[in-house]
Amino acid sequence: MTDIPPADRRIVSSRHLAQGDGWELSELEFGLIVGFNAFSRWVTRCMAAAGQPDLSPLEILILHNVNHRDKDKRLSDISFLLNIEDSHTVNYALRKLLKAELLVSEKRGKEVFYRTSPEGIALCEAYRDVRRQCLLNGLSPAEMSGAELRELARMLRALSGHYDQASRAAATL
């Protein structure tokens, strides 16, 4: 057993990154890693239960983004809103969603705009129903309130800005 009190134990995936100052960031990063993987698994299982088992997490997120506010979106809009640098992955996902008839596209001048098809809208609604049944109904307000969830979302968005700036700095090295 260890002599370190439970409150002082470092829960990290890379001990070499958790030594010295800033070790708490390594603990947060480990939480992000397992959270990202759990979220990816969740969205694919939720979408499968909604009736579409063949979509990747990115394709699911893009479908929901295009469906958001019933507004046509361009490739650049989707990439920007989801903070995806590699637009080729977004373009590939859009083609797959078009082939599955979950999206429709319309060329306007040099730009292509995407919107959710009636089948895509129905799938997003089925996903929402599964999400409500399996995820929301299992989340107790005692575990995390709506205000706490909003604050966590705000902190994650702020942290993403910090990581974006750090990635730009690293690219200059």
Stretch-by-stretch model annotation:
Residues 31, 61-64, 122:
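Pre-recognition alpha-helix immediately N-terminal to the DNA-recognition helix
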Residues 44-85:
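N-terminal helix-turn-helix DNA-binding core of bacterial DNA-binding proteins
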Residues 1-21, 144-173:
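C-terminal regulatory/oligomerization modules of transcriptional regulators
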Residues 37, 64-68, 128:
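Short, locally clustered residues in the helix-turn-helix/winged-helix DNA-binding domain
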Residues 1-53:
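N-terminal leader segment of winged-helix/HTH proteins
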Residues 89-90:
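Helix-turn-helix DNA-binding helix
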Residues 95-149:
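Charged, amphipathic alpha-helical coiled-coil/dimerization segments
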Residues 63, 78, 93-100:
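Basic amphipathic alpha-helical segments that dock to polyanions
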